[in-house]
From Swiss-Prot:
<feature type="compositionally biased region" description="Acidic residues">
    <location>
        <begin position="140"/>
        <end position="152"/>
    </location>
</feature>
<keyword id="KW-0970">Cilium biogenesis/degradation</keyword>
<feature type="modified residue" description="N-acetylmethionine">
    <location>
        <position position="1"/>
    </location>
</feature>
<keyword id="KW-0007">Acetylation</keyword>
<feature type="modified residue" description="Phosphoserine">
    <location>
        <position position="115"/>
    </location>
</feature>
<keyword id="KW-0175">Coiled coil</keyword>
<dbReference type="Pfam" id="PF13270">
    <property type="entry name" value="CCDC28"/>
</dbReference>
<keyword id="KW-0206">Cytoskeleton</keyword>
<feature type="compositionally biased region" description="Basic residues">
    <location>
        <begin position="1"/>
        <end position="10"/>
    </location>
</feature>
<protein>
    <recommendedName>
        <fullName>Coiled-coil domain-containing protein 28B</fullName>
    </recommendedName>
</protein>
<comment type="subunit">
    <text>Interacts with BBS1, BBS2, BBS4, BBS5, BBS6, BBS7 and TTC8/BBS8. Interacts with MAPKAP1/SIN1 isoform 1 and RICTOR.</text>
</comment>
<dbReference type="GO" id="GO:0005813">
    <property type="term" value="C:centrosome"/>
</dbReference>
<keyword id="KW-0963">Cytoplasm</keyword>
<dbReference type="GO" id="GO:0005737">
    <property type="term" value="C:cytoplasm"/>
</dbReference>
<feature type="region of interest" description="Disordered">
    <location>
        <begin position="140"/>
        <end position="165"/>
    </location>
</feature>
<dbReference type="InterPro" id="IPR025271">
    <property type="entry name" value="CCDC28"/>
</dbReference>
<dbReference type="GO" id="GO:0060271">
    <property type="term" value="P:cilium assembly"/>
</dbReference>
């Protein structure tokens, strides 16, 4: 049991009891086994997982240096954070304010004039337009396939098909124009706001 633990972690962790300086123990790995068997892993991890393991290994375990430089051998080193605690509290407060604004509906995307309801309306129009465009495309393909299979054009006369296609195309263009106008209003509101602020 003890041998398996040593094989799994050949590098001594700082949390383990410290050894005398200059005495690093190496666990012999049989040459007949692959690296994954020597580590007790069932298979080699993917490249992403390997990078994750490397990072986790660097953070958790560090070999004890021969010189013993930088602290006593018996006490573990503490991780030093690059971010100040006050900065973390400030970011936390900002995120909480953002969350409160989101839940209250005060969150603005393109300025004070544009709300998420307007953006939601634009998104719904885009989806409606995409569905209409897709259904027109599918209907046209199905009609072409039916005509090829039958060899004879049954169903609607050619003139009716043309008027129906024109009507659908007009509806598609009308929806596209509405969508374009809505997006244009959002952009105009966004561009107008920076001009208003310096004057105030």
């Amino acid at each position: 049991m003890e041998d398996k633990k040593k094989k799994r972690s050949p590098k001594p962790c700082l949390t383990q009891p410290a050894q005398a300086p200059g005495t690093l123990r190496r666990v012999p790995v049989p040459t007949s086994h692959s690296g994954s068997l020597a580590l007790g892993l069932p298979h080699l991890p993917s490249p992403k997982q390997r990078a994750k393991f490397k990072r986790a290994g660097k953070e958790k375990c560090r070999p004890v240096l021969a010189g013993g430089g930088g602290g006593s051998a018996g006490t573990p080193l503490q991780h030093s954070f690059l971010t100040e605690v006050t900065d973390v509290y400030e970011m936390e407060g900002g995120l909480l304010n953002l969350l409160n604004d989101f839940h209250s509906g005060r969150l603005q995307a393109f300025g004070k004039e544009c709300s998420f309801e307007q953006l939601e309306h634009v998104r719904e129009m885009q989806e409606k337009l995409a569905r209409l465009h897709f259904s027109l495309d599918v209907c046209g393909e199905e009609e072409d396939e039916e005509e090829e299979e039958d060899g004879v054009t049954e169903g609607l006369p050619e003139e009716q098909k043309k008027t129906m296609a024109d009507r659908n195309l007009d509806q598609l263009l009308s929806n596209l124009e509405d969508l374009s106008n809505s997006i244009q209003k959002l952009h105009l509101a966004e561009n107008a706001e920076p001009e208003d602020q310096p004057a105030a």
